[in-house]
Amino acid sequence: MIETYNQPSPRSAATGLPVRMKIFMYLLTIFLITQMIGSALFAVYLHRRLDKIEDERNLHEDFVFMKTIQRCNTGERSLSLLNCEEIKSQFEGFVKDIMLNKEEKKKENSFEMQKGDQNPQIAAHVISEASSKTTSVLQWAEKGYYTMSNNLVTLENGKQLTVKRQGLYYIYAQVTFCSNREASSQAPFIASLCLKSPGRFERILLRAANTHSSAKPCGQQSIHLGGVFELQPGASVFVNVTDPSQVSHGTGFTSFGLLKL
């Protein structure tokens, strides 16, 4: 009887090598990443620390400079034989520059204020007054949503806006009227924007007309006037109509105003 014996093959020593290599590479990667993060944090810390040291050094230099000026003013002499005259001249020049900058800023602010005073905003907006039904020159009142910016424009006698500053003005008027009332004549309803200058005759700046209507009830119609004109100090503007009894004085119907450009 022949017996066969199979000898087991020896275990390869290289089977554990890949596992060890993976562990080594993993640890090496973690080490490199940690080192990179640590280096970045250290760089940030070092940069901030250097900035802080630089600020402290500048403050120290300023402190030394001020102490040196104090010693020069008191007549003391340091061991380094500092040139007090040169240091004083540098300090005086520095202070002079600061004062000049302040003076320039003050002049700029003063110029802006003077410019605002020279060109103030002038505006006015007034509302019609019902008492103007008996006169061809419409009357106005400072009521409701009115505007009177300052004393450079005034409402005189309730009839005219007078300006005290020369310039270009946008002047406007809106007149609303009832067109089917019994009119004294068959002539169209006419609204005129007029100017009265000091020492001159009155003259018409703008004029608009609208025909009467037979519609009932009362048919409200509006006339709009507006334009840009050069006004002299003391000039007055007013609104004239052919039939004041037809003018509507309800809220927002009839108004008058100007604005300096």
From Swiss-Prot:
GO terms for biological process: B cell differentiation; B cell proliferation; CD40 signaling pathway; inflammatory response; integrin-mediated signaling pathway; isotype switching; negative regulation of apoptotic process; platelet activation. The record marks 112-113 as: Cleavage. It is a single-pass type II membrane protein. The keyword Transcription regulation does not apply. Residues 1-22 are cytoplasmic. Glycans are attached at residue 240. One of its GO terms (cellular component) is cell surface. SUPFAM superfamilies: TNF-like. The keyword Transmembrane helix applies. The chain crosses the membrane at residues 23-43. Residues 44-261 are extracellular. The soluble form derives from the membrane form by proteolytic processing. It is found in: Cell membrane; Cell surface. Residues 122-261 form the THD domain. InterPro entries: CD40L (IPR003263), TNF_CS (IPR021184), TNF_dom (IPR006052), Tumour_necrosis_fac-like_dom (IPR008983). Cytokine that acts as a ligand to CD40/TNFRSF5. Costimulates T-cell proliferation and cytokine production. Its cross-linking on T-cells generates a costimulatory signal which enhances the production of IL4 and IL10 in conjunction with the TCR/CD3 ligation and CD28 costimulation. Induces the activation of NF-kappa-B. Induces the activation of kinases MAPK8 and PAK2 in T-cells. Mediates B-cell proliferation in the absence of co-stimulus as well as IgE production in the presence of IL4. Involved in immunoglobulin class switching. Homotrimer. Interacts with CD28. CD40 ligand, soluble form: Exists as either a monomer or a homotrimer. Forms a ternary complex between CD40 and integrins for CD40-CD40LG signaling. This is CD40 ligand. It comes from Cercocebus atys (Sooty mangabey).
